[in-house]
Curated annotation (Swiss-Prot):
It is a single-pass membrane protein. The chain crosses the membrane at residues 4-24. The lineage of its organism: Bacteria, Pseudomonadati, Pseudomonadota, Gammaproteobacteria, Pasteurellales. GO terms for cellular component: membrane. This is Uncharacterized protein HI_0134.
Length: 391
C-alpha cells in the first residue's frame, strides 16, 4: 500500500512538474512578446491546479489593465500544447484618464497559444466576449455581449489590422458578417447582416488624447435589430437609414444625436387609426383597418433625437401613413424606459386637413398609454369638420 501511494505521489509530482515546465515555456514566450511590443508588466504569476497565467498592472502606449488572466485547457497542456480557452481583463483603460474602465471576459474554443502569438489568427467554434463598464454608458446600458462562430485576425501589417467575424451577434441580436480595419487612432467596422435587400452599417471610432468620437450609420438596416443593438425599446419595425454620433471624454459620454428615417414598417403596440376613427369624421376602408387591433403601418417615420444625460430628446417626429400625417416631439427616459410623446395627427384627406388631433403618449415605451388633448381649438375644428361633411 505504501509503495502504491509512493508511486502515485511520484506520478503526480511528475505531472505537475511537466505542467510547470509547459507553463514556464508559455511564460517565456509571453515575456518575449511583451518585450517586442514594449509592454510593461509589474509581475507574472503561474497557477498549476487550474492551469493559468496572470499578469499584474499592464501598461502600454494604447491601453492599461489592472490584471490579465489567461486560462489553459488541462489535457492539451499534458501533451505539450498550451491551448488557451479563456481570458479575463480587469479594469481595462484605453487612456490614462479613463474614468469608466471595463472588465472584459473572453471565452473561446481552445486553440494553440502558438497560433495566438502568430501574425495571423483563426478562431472557430463558439466564442463569446462580455464587456462590462463600471458605470452605464447611457441609461442603464453598461454591459455588451458579443459572440461569433469564426474569426480571422491579421496582424501581419502595422499600418492596418483587418479583423473578420462570421455569424456574429451583439446583445443576442444576429448581425451576420463584420469586418474591422484599424489604422493609427481610427477603427472602421463594416456590418453586413442578413436581410431582404442590400443593407449595411458602418461604425467609425476615432480617439485623440482623452477625446473619442463614434459615428454609426447605416442604409436599409432592420429597425428592430438596430434598436436591440442600442438597447432601445422595441417600438418600430421596417428598415431604416440612420446616422448616429456619440462624443466621449475620458470614456464618459458627453453628447449624442441621431437622425433616423424608417420606411415601410409598423409602430408596434399602438394603432393610431383605431384612435383617430373615434374622433375624425372619416370613413376608413377594410384594408386600412384590418390590423386595427395590432400596430400602425407607416410609409415613413422620421426621428431627430438628442441624448441629454439619461434622456433621449425627440426634437422632431414626422409620420406618414396612407391615411394619416403626424408631427410631434417627446422624451424617452432611458433609465426607466418610459416615454412622454406629443404628436399632432392630420388626415391625408384634403377635406379634413384643417382638423388636427393632439395625442399624448406616456408610460412604458413598449406598451404606452395615451390621452386625447381636447383643447378648445380642437373642438372648434371638429365642429367645422362635421359641418363640412354634412353639406
Amino acid at each position: 500500500m505504501k509503495k502504491f501511494a509512493l508511486i502515485v505521489g511520484i506520478v503526480a509530482l511528475a505531472i505537475f512538474s511537466f505542467l510547470y515546465i509547459q507553463l514556464y515555456r508559455v511564460q517565456s514566450a509571453i515575456n518575449e512578446q511583451l518585450a517586442q511590443q514594449n509592454i510593461a508588466v509589474q509581475s507574472i504569476n503561474l497557477s498549476l491546479f487550474s492551469p493559468a497565467l496572470s499578469l499584474e498592472n499592464i501598461k502600454t502606449t494604447q491601453f492599461s489593465a489592472q490584471k490579465i488572466e489567461a486560462k489553459f485547457s488541462f489535457l492539451p497542456l499534458l501533451y505539450g500544447n498550451a491551448a488557451l480557452h479563456s481570458l479575463n481583463i480587469q479594469q481595462l483603460k484605453l487612456t490614462q484618464n479613463t474614468q469608466n474602465p471595463a472588465n472584459v471576459s473572453i471565452e473561446i474554443s481552445p486553440f494553440s497559444l502558438k497560433q495566438l502569438l502568430s501574425k495571423k489568427v483563426i478562431l472557430n467554434g463558439e466564442n463569446h466576449i462580455r464587456i462590462e463598464f463600471n458605470k452605464p454608458i447611457y441609461g442603464k446600458t453598461k454591459t455588451f455581449h458579443f459572440s461569433f462562430h469564426k474569426a480571422n485576425l491579421d496582424f501581419s501589417t502595422s499600418e492596418s489590422t483587418p479583423l473578420q467575424f462570421v455569424d456574429a451577434s451583439l446583445n443576442n441580436q444576429p448581425i451576420g458578417y463584420i469586418e474591422t480595419h484599424t489604422a493609427h487612432q481610427q477603427i472602421v467596422t463594416y456590418i453586413k447582416p442578413q436581410c431582404d435587400n442590400d443593407c449595411l452599417a458602418v461604425l467609425k471610432y476615432q480617439q485623440i488624447d482623452n477625446q473619442s468620437a463614434v459615428n454609426f450609420s447605416g442604409k436599409y438596416f432592420p429597425v428592430q435589430r438596430l434598436f436591440a443593438l442600442l438597447n432601445l425599446p422595441e417600438m418600430l419595425s421596417g428598415h431604416a437609414d440612420f446616422d448616429l454620433d456619440f462624443s466621449f471624454s475620458s470614456s464618459s459620454l458627453i453628447q449624442g444625436k441621431l437622425n433616423f428615417l424608417a420606411q415601410n414598417g409598423e409602430i408596434l403596440g399602438v394603432n393610431l387609426l383605431d384612435m383617430v376613427a373615434q374622433y375624425f369624421p372619416i370613413n376608413y376602408n377594410n384594408d386600412l383597418l384590418q390590423n386595427k387591433e395590432l400596430n400602425t403601418r407607416f410609409e415613413q417615420f422620421y426621428l431627430q433625437l438628442f441624448l441629454q444625460q439619461n434622456q433621449l430628446i425627440a426634437e422632431k417626429i414626422e409620420l406618414k401613413t396612407p391615411a394619416l400625417l403626424g408631427q410631434g416631439k417627446g422624451i424617452i427616459d432611458l433609465n426607466r424606459m418610459e416615454c412622454n410623446v406629443d404628436i399632432n395627427l392630420n388626415s391625408t384627406d384634403q377635406r379634413y386637413q384643417n382638423l388636427t388631433l393632439p395625442i399624448n403618449f406616456f408610460g412604458n415605451c413598449n406598451s404606452p398609454q395615451y390621452k386625447i388633448n381636447f383643447t378648445k381649438k380642437f373642438r372648434h375644428q371638429l365642429i367645422d369638420a362635421i359641418k363640412e361633411k354634412l353639406r
